[in-house]
């Protein structure tokens, strides 16, 4: 299976009532882990490339690395640019062959957010690439941007509809009670708001801050219209704990292939766990 447009992938998930995991990659081992888990579970997935990784590795090198490991992959995969705040970077990702791009203008005024997001959505649409925008303020820390939880704002139905109409994005990220990073307390999701917006908008919705949200809450949100669930923190924790355990068991282990391999295996287990929760296992055959 070749790469597939994020738009096609999420519209299929939305129609069929399951969620697609958008898993953040950071290096070769995390790319391998995400793809191996998807293959084992026969699941469509998104690989996300975030801003911190772009700062450390570079946009083009990350896409090239993913391309290398995609050669023998048989499940549908979309590479997604996450939380882009620079129009030039978004256009570069489109040129590099990303299948999905997000412009995050949530820190801007409504008008500027909609205007800039539409520029990205229009460019992506011409090439059949999926586009994502964000309306509302999602709490927590994502790369170099922090939104205090007290400043987080639940997205209203009115602003979601107006933003979707103005920006023309294919799928929309909402502020629904989740947060980026590690939760200080269990999140309270605005299920009624998800349902209202989904019924009015009739297009895939996106959950950011999907790590550590209770499984039952995630499943309920998917049933109400969430089609893309972003997962990063839980994967990084699993990978790091896998490495730590390897080094604790073997204090004199200096072969990075061993410790990184242990991290990858732990991450594979976590990705497979999430795929089961999202309901995308064996959904690759529907493409």
Swiss-Prot record:
UniProt-listed GO biological process terms: carbohydrate metabolic process
Gene3D superfamilies: Aldolase class I (3.20.20.70)
Pfam families assigned to the protein according to its UniProt record, in alphabetical order: F_bP_aldolase
UniProt-annotated catalytic positions: 82 (proton donor)
Role played: Part of the sulfo-EMP2 pathway, a D-sulfoquinovose degradation pathway that produces sulfolactate (SL). Cleaves 6-deoxy-6-sulfo-D-fructose 1-phosphate (SFP) to form dihydroxyacetone phosphate (DHAP) and 3-sulfolactaldehyde (SLA).
Family note: Belongs to the class II fructose-bisphosphate aldolase family.
Protein name: Sulfofructosephosphate aldolase
Species per Swiss-Prot/TrEMBL record: Alkalicoccus urumqiensis
């Amino acid at each position: 299976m070749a790469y597939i447009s994020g738009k096609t992938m999420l519209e299929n998930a939305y129609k069929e009532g399951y969620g697609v995991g958008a898993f953040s990659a950071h290096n070769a081992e995390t790319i391998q882990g995400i793809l191996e888990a998807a293959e084992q579970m026969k699941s469509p997935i998104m690989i996300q490339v975030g801003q911190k990784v772009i700062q450390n590795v570079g946009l083009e090198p990350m896409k090239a690395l993913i391309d290398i490991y995609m050669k023998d992959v048989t499940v549908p995969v979309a590479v997604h640019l996450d939380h882009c705040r620079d129009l030039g970077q978004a256009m570069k990702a489109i040129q590099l062959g990303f299948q999905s791009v997000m412009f995050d203008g949530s820190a801007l005024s409504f008008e500027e957010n909609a205007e800039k997001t539409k520029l990205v959505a229009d460019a992506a649409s011409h090439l059949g690439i999926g586009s994502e925008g964000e309306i509302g303020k999602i709490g927590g820390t994502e790369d170099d941007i922090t939104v205090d939880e007290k400043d987080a704002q639940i997205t209203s139905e009115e602003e979601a509809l107006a933003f979707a109409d103005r920006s023309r994005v294919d799928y929309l990220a909402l502020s629904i009670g989740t947060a980026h990073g590690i939760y200080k307390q269990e999140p309270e999701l605005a299920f009624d708001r998800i349902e209202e917006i989904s019924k009015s908008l009739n297009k895939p919705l996106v959950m950011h801050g999907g790590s550590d949200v209770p499984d039952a809450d995630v499943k309920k949100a998917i049933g109400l219209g969430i089609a893309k669930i972003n997962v990063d923190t839980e994967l990084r924790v699993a990978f790091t704990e896998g490495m730590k355990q390897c080094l604790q068991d073997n204090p004199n282990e200096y072969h990075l292939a061993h410790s990184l391999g242990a991290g990858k295996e732990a991450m594979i287990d976590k990705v497979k766990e999430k795929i089961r929760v999202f309901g995308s296992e064996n959904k690759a055959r529907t493409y």
